[in-house]
């Protein structure tokens, strides 16, 4: 460890003559509030970690300039485009059209036979199955949205479905899942079922069961898998299984750039006991390194100690590059 620190110091001294200095903002707009910073933190190798760079003005670095849109690819959009390419569907569409279809098209427009998107999707079997899924997802959308009452600090779920409505959509989703021939779409149905149960508030155990039955068995390293894992972690947290929940949040943080901020904000360690219990869920040193990184990004943590912990068990970790 001493040799490593000495090497880092030597490297830092060596690059001083060749590196233009970088100013850091100290929390205000006046020159005297700036400080000297030898290293440009924007040279970070993993752009998915950019929101966690040093900042004194916002909860996450660059929130005023929305760096996510500039630095992080849309993992959901890319997953859809990969699926369409694999199944020779919607190949004439560009990225902007994909975004409109996936994020802006209404349920009503997806039910119109004359809609250009409906016509295009109906050209292939994968497209027809996608259209059926998107219609189902749009039906559930109102129950997953947030509403602002008095402001952003008082945001709540817009509505939970009644028990009757929940049963209807659950049964519909299960039927669509069973008859869908595409694993990528089955995974998305599984995610919808987990999320629907989780947002019912009194269906946390059912949300966990839905994950175990309809998401986990598909064994897909996919953005939607980690979105479902995040919902499952929330359900576990709601029933008091904090160690398991924190571990799952660390898995989401480790594997999905687009979900990192949510996973970080949801990760809650209140005592050494909580930490030790969460660590027992880790299967290898890579997973432990992600846990140390999550704890290290906390405002009140000892960052140097967490870096040393990671170096000791997993020196190739992306969190120290």
Regions found by a protein language model. Give the residues of each.
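Bacterial N-terminal signal peptides that target proteins for export
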Residues: 1-8
């Amino acid at each position: 460890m001493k040799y490593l620190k000495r090497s880092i110091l030597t490297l830092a001294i060596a690059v001083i003559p060749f590196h233009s200095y970088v100013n850091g903002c100290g929390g205000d707009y006046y020159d005297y509030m700036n400080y000297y910073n030898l290293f440009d933190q924007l040279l970070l190798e993993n752009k998915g970690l950019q929101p966690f760079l040093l900042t004194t003005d916002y909860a996450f670095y660059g929130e005023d300039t929305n760096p996510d849109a500039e630095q992080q690819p849309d993992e959901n959009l890319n997953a859809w485009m990969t699926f369409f390419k694999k199944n020779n569907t919607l190949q004439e569409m560009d990225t902007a059209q994909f975004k409109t279809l996936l994020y802006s098209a209404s349920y009503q427009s997806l039910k119109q036979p004359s809609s250009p998107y409906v016509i295009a999707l109906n050209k292939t079997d994968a497209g027809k199955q996608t259209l059926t899924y998107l219609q189902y997802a749009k039906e559930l959308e109102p129950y997953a949205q947030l509403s602002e009452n008095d402001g952003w600090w008082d945001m709540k779920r817009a509505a939970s479905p009644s028990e009757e409505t929940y049963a209807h959509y659950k049964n519909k989703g299960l039927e669509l899942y069973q008859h869908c021939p595409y694993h990528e779409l089955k995974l998305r149905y599984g995610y919808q079922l987990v999320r629907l149960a989780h947002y019912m508030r009194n269906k946390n155990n059912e949300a966990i069961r839905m994950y175990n039955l309809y998401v986990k068995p598909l064994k897909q390293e996919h953005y939607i898998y980690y979105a479902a894992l995040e919902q499952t972690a929330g359900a576990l947290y709601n029933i008091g299984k904090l160690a398991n929940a924190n571990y799952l949040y660390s898995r989401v943080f480790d594997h999905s750039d687009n979900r990192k901020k949510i996973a970080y904000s949801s990760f809650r360690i209140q005592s050494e006991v909580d930490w030790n219990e969460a660590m027992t869920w880790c299967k290898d040193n890579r997973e432990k390194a992600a846990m140390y990184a999550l704890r290290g990004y906390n405002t009140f943590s000892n960052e140097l100690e967490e870096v040393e912990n990671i170096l000791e068990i997993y020196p190739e970790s992306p969190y120290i590059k």
